[in-house]
Amino acid sequence: MNNNSSGGKAIRGLDVLILGFAFFATYFGAGNLIFPPQLGLNSGSDFLSGLAGLTLSGIFLPIFTLIVIGLNGDVHSITERVGKNTYNVLLAALMLVCTFVSIPRTCATAIQLGIQGNLPAAPFIPLVIAYFVISFFFVADQNNVMDRMGKYLTPLLALILVIVAFVGIFNPLGTPVAPAVDHPFVNAFLGGYNTGDVLVSFIMAAVFISSIYGKGYTTVGQRNKVLIYCGIVSFVLLLIIYGSLLYMGACVSGDYAQNIGRAELLVAIIQRVGTWVMVPMGIAVVLACLTTAIGQIAAVAEFTSTATGNRISYKQVAVACCILSALTALLGVDGIVTYIGWIFGICYPPCLALLVLGIIGRFMPNNSAYKGSVYLVTLFALLESLPGLSSLGFAKAIVAATPLSTYGFGWIVPFIIGLIGGSIIGHFVSASEPVEAEAK
């Protein structure tokens, strides 16, 4: 691969491979290791339909989101038509989610599932400290975070997973039985959709794009090409791993109850592959968690230092993030999960709305179309998920009456209403309003 965009250096295949591996590792957290077997268990003999649904929502959608953000320039280019402070508010909220939810959860999962699963007596607190010391080591060099991950951590993670996948595919664990759900495609699509990996694209976009620039690809054309190539590498890796895990779940669909826990099912599958897999899979869990944490700590540090005009340095923010996340990780997986649902429910719909706007933005007649859709989607998300508000009678009634809300797509109707209503209001009230940012 030696494509040469005018005014820049040739695109090197090794660079694409390293960055693509790093992108893959950032998306592939331990949660992504656990849920495909469950979807396979549900899909049974119709596992190909399940894989198609998971591929569309759990692989294509997040990577497509990243590419859309890149082609628009950055997240700010999409949000600025909603309002000048939208970018800072959105990213600040997502960075808080990283610091107090997703990063601590990776740590707790790595220790409880990856380490204590093999060494039950391993001490929790010292391991938490070690986890974030290692994370900071990789994060400290701002310009080479993705490069370090792609060179050292991700190849080992991918190697372990590919070996297990190879064994699981070519030495089937059983024979898939009839699907336990009526529509395996829809079930798997919703399973992938509800992982919320689209949020990762919004959180990590700046770090991903910065890592491409750091490789010397400084023109817009080069950046976009490398981003797309890296997306393809990441897509292929995720498809191989997800597909094999889903297939292994399908192969044991006649042996386990549908209500078996996700982690319990994964452990059962690993044991059936062979006890020799327990330690390598434990390492894979730790690496999957660690690479996700490293990427998100870097994102928090980069956003915060930039937002403060570097009055707080990148390294200072990284240290603070590690400390706060470590303290939160002490709650353990169960303690963190108790408050994760409503936070996810509020943040996810506005990001999906922005994704759609990033695609169709050039066709929007005015900025009010942006404002109306995002504001109404955010209001719906608050009614649906905010503790205290979501339990009120009127909020429940509105959510229940909204089409598709039972499937997690309730935001679509408010989005369409806001888009149309905003366009009309913008036409009559703000006809003279200039378009502040054209879609790129």
Where in this protein do the model-derived segments appear?
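Hydrophobic, small-residue-rich membrane helices and short re-entrant helix-turn-helix hairpins
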Residues: 141-152, 184-188, 208-237, 254-267, ...
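Membrane helical hairpin/interfacial module
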Residues: 40-136, 140
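Hydrophobic, membrane-embedded alpha-helices of multi-pass small-molecule transporters
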Residues: 18-28, 95, 99, 165-174, ...
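TM-loop-TM module centered on a large, flexible mid-protein loop between adjacent transmembrane helices
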Residues: 76-80, 240-290, 341-344
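Membrane-water interface regions at transmembrane-helix termini and the short interhelical loops
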Residues: 70-77, 132-153, 214-217, 326-339, ...
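A generic transmembrane alpha-helix motif of multi-pass inner-membrane proteins
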Residues: 164, 171, 367-440
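Transmembrane alpha-helical segments of multi-pass small-molecule transport proteins
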Residues: 18-27, 55-58, 89-93, 118-140, ...
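Membrane-helix boundary/coupling elements in multi-pass transport proteins
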Residues: 102-107, 278-309
